């Protein structure tokens, strides 16, 4: 991955052997100091993510710019961005119970939750999630050697130019989508503060001066981008892992194979499969260690966000114009997009893991030739036991397994909580009408 003079990203593929051989020439002491990521799997395939992080002030330590004269200015920019995001998050959380002076009439029309509270809570959740995502990205940068070993030294040996180029283009597409949604959320907030949109307002972060309003929009842009970057990184790591599982299945059950190979050939095949499976298991463990809590937090955060935004859209849907409806739709779409980026890849890994178990049974059956060596059968039995004991399934904070059943439970919970909010609102409205009727003094005419 290089940046040309026209500021466009260009993909240049290098074979896995070149990157692995160059890595072996370095000493252990040099590994601890720095690793040249210029021709590695991480730097090339995930290059668009790192470039976008540099622009946002979340510069990845793999970047070649950190070895130039811009090292210290970029470092200051990075920490300044995190400091602004942290201060804005604390400020917004402290404003959750505050009321906006411009929304008294709109808030009074809502019997359960007023729009100011809902949108302030949504902003607080967005900023806090973005702050947590920013620190997670910082943690992953410190563990760049671990990612290097997992992707380049392990799964990278099964890559090919077409697959890498596809991942590279997909990353560019995801970055464009992330930028578009982050810019849209920022624009909606600035336009609301400037009274161009008649949306429920939130308490001012500082005041309504133009530069503070722009700062508030910038914070929302950074927070949304951080969340998207973590989701995209998780999605791509899972895609790489899924591709490697597919390669392992083809290695276990090749299309063209001898009817009854020699015991030495079978032992070598089993040995190669064991090494490849261990590399995949290490990659899965790396992903789970770094993203398990993020999966759990995403489900815990997206469910209330979707319910609250859906309630506001339902209550304000008749009176709202097209711009207001579109703004709420942007919030909902952005929330569901982050949820899908965290969910679908985890489901795909679980399904590929089930295919791997099926392939292990088929591979075991193909070893049952006449006069089969007992050592081959024992090694194959151990491999099958290893695959069944360490299933390739991700967990969300070790609370539940990530599979398609969770998605059904998710939508069921969102729909249930949404109906509860609507029911409470209808009961409050009915109770308010009864109170108004009881206060009317009925004077009967004299007989």
Swiss-Prot record:
Its main subcellular localisation, reduced to a broad class, is membrane
GO CC field: axon; dendrite; membrane; neuronal cell body; nucleus
Q: Which residues lie on this side of the membrane: Cytoplasmic?
A: 91-116, 193-211, 314-328, 427-447
Q: Which Pfam families match?
A: 7tm_7
- Looking at the record's lineage, which domain of life comes first? Eukaryota
Q: Member of which family?
A: Belongs to the insect chemoreceptor superfamily. Gustatory receptor (GR) family.
Know the name of this protein? Gustatory receptor family protein 3
This protein's species is Caenorhabditis elegans
């Amino acid at each position: 991955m290089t940046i040309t003079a026209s500021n466009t990203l260009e993909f240049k593929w290098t074979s896995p052997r070149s990157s692995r051989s160059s890595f072996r020439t370095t000493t252990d002491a040099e590994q601890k100091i720095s690793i040249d990521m210029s021709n590695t799997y991480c730097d090339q395939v995930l290059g668009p993510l790192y470039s976008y992080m540099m622009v946002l002030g979340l510069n990845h330590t793999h970047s070649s710019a950190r070895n130039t004269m811009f090292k210290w200015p970029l470092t200051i920019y990075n920490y300044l961005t995190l400091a602004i995001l942290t201060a804005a998050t604390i400020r917004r959380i402290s404003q959750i119970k505050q009321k906006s002076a411009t929304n008294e009439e709109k808030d009074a029309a809502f019997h359960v939750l007023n729009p100011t509270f809902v949108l302030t809570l949504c902003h607080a959740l967005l900023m806090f999630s973005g702050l947590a995502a920013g620190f997670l990205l910082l943690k992953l940068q410190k563990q760049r050697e671990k990612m290097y070993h997992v992707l380049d030294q392990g799964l990278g040996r099964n890559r090919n130019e077409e697959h890498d180029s596809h991942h590279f283009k997909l990353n560019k597409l995801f970055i464009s989508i992330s930028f578009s949604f982050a810019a849209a959320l920022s624009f909606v907030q600035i336009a609301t503060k400037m009274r161009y949109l008649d949306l429920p307002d939130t308490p001012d972060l500082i005041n309504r001066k133009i530069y503070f309003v722009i700062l508030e929009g910038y914070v929302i842009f950074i927070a949304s981008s951080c969340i998207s970057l973590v989701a995209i990184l998780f999605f791509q790591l899972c895609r790489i892992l899924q591709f490697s599982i597919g390669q392992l299945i083809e290695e276990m059950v090749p299309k063209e194979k001898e009817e009854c190979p020699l015991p030495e050939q079978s032992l070598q095949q089993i040995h190669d499969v064991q090494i490849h499976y261990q590399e995949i298991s290490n990659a899965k463990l790396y992903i789970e260690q770094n993203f398990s809590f993020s999966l759990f937090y995403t489900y815990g955060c997206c469910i209330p966000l979707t319910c609250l935004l859906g309630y506001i859209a339902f209550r304000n849907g008749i009176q709202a114009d097209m711009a207001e409806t579109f703004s709420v739709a942007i919030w909902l779409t952005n929330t569901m997009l982050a949820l899908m980026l965290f969910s679908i890849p985890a489901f795909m890994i679980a399904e590929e893991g089930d295919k791997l178990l099926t392939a292990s049974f088929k591979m075991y059956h193909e070893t049952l030739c006449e006069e089969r060596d007992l050592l081959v059968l024992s090694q194959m039995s151990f491999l099958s036991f290893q695959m069944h004991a360490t299933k390739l399934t991700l967990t969300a904070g070790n609370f539940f397994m990530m599979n398609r059943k969770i998605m059904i439970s998710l939508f069921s919970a969102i729909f249930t909580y949404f109906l509860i909010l609507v029911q409470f609102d209808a009961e409050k409205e009915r109770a308010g009408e009864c109170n108004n009727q009881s206060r009317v003094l009925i004077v009967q005419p004299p007989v």
